[in-house]
Amino acid sequence: MAVKVYENVVSKDQRKILLDYFKTTDDLVDSRPDVRSKTPVWNQTTNWPQDTVKQILDDIIKLKYDPEWIFFYMLRQYPFRPFPLHVDSGDGDQSKLHKNILIPLDLDGPATTIVFKNKWHGPSTRFGTTNVSPFRYEILNHGGAIQVIEDIRELKDISHLRITQEELDRLIEVRSGKVNQRVTDYTNIEGYDPNIKFDKQIHQQYLSHIPIENLHGLTIDSIIEWKLGDVITFDRQHLHSAGSGHSKKIGLTVTTNVGD
């Protein structure tokens, strides 16, 4: 089964512990206009609730596992965009990849994750047939209007924008990395069929932040509604995206490898 939802396995006390940690400001915080995140490292970072996360994982994973990536995040929906179509496959070593594990922690408005039947057998990447520069960004000005910046590297005056210089510098650094490279040729996506046209109604309701051209040829496996207390799992090779609709949501993603 590609997707499995474990219902009511995370207690209110466990969620509070994880939320309190996420909301604490420390050196791990990465704050940008559209997302705030923290990425502690398993068995290396101190003073984070690893034991709580391990309790949750041990309840749902029955084989030996190694957490590779721990990602706490808060997404703001409007006017920004949810996470795009992507895959969290690490370096792409198929022999070790196990599960994406998603733990909803808090939400404002209907929140969903869309998982596709299609798989990618390469390293982590984003997908889009339209080639958009990673340096194109939307930022609110102080009047509350969206300002489209075609290249944030060329942005010199930020006095009219709701972004600090520190946030801008960090954004440029992140957008310069390999993680922001994207696959525009879908030929090597498992299950891709160029004759399939993506459903317009589903696009409008759940994936309006992604150009529909980027979804043609793909097939949805599951549209998963976020519910507090649940844990969502699926194979790391599966293409997936955050759904549109929420105002704000906070979650924890853990990617695991098969343990030795």
Q: What role is predicted for each listed range?
A:
Residues 1-74, 80-82, 126-186:
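Non-heme Fe(II)/2-oxoglutarate
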